[in-house]
Amino acid sequence: MPLAQGPWDTAFWLICLGISINAAVVPLHAWLVDAYPEGTVTGSVFLSSFTTKVAVYCLIRIFAGTDFLIWFGVLMALYGACYAIMENDMRRLLSYHIVSQVGFMVAGVGLGTAMALNGATAHAFSISFISHCSLCVPRDHLCDWYPQNQPAGRSC
């Protein structure tokens, strides 16, 4: 006997939850902000390319036009931007920036129109290249550009 009938059944919500974790939707985003800065440069680039962007693709294929994604996308965009402004560590700042940018993509998926879905896809494609470039900056060079990022008693 199924738990529920129709498009809003248990399987729908479990699949949505799994993809939302992968997309780092705001209540489920903590793994991204902790994992990206701590990984190696190569690891961060691969994480940036193959986690959130694949999740956005899955959202496009499965959940296009789902209204609640609009609100989660707007929340992600605002949350990521606000926390990026307050962050002192450059790689964590870039991680919050990724949360913010994925929020724009999720909001586009929630709209569900052809133009919004094309925009979300193009945004995911272009942000993956921008993330590659920005996450490839070694930590040693970040201290030259962002001097208040230096730990006390240590010079970069």
Regions found by a protein language model. Give the residues of each.
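Hydrophobic transmembrane alpha-helices and their helix-loop junctions in integral membrane proteins
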Residues: 1-156
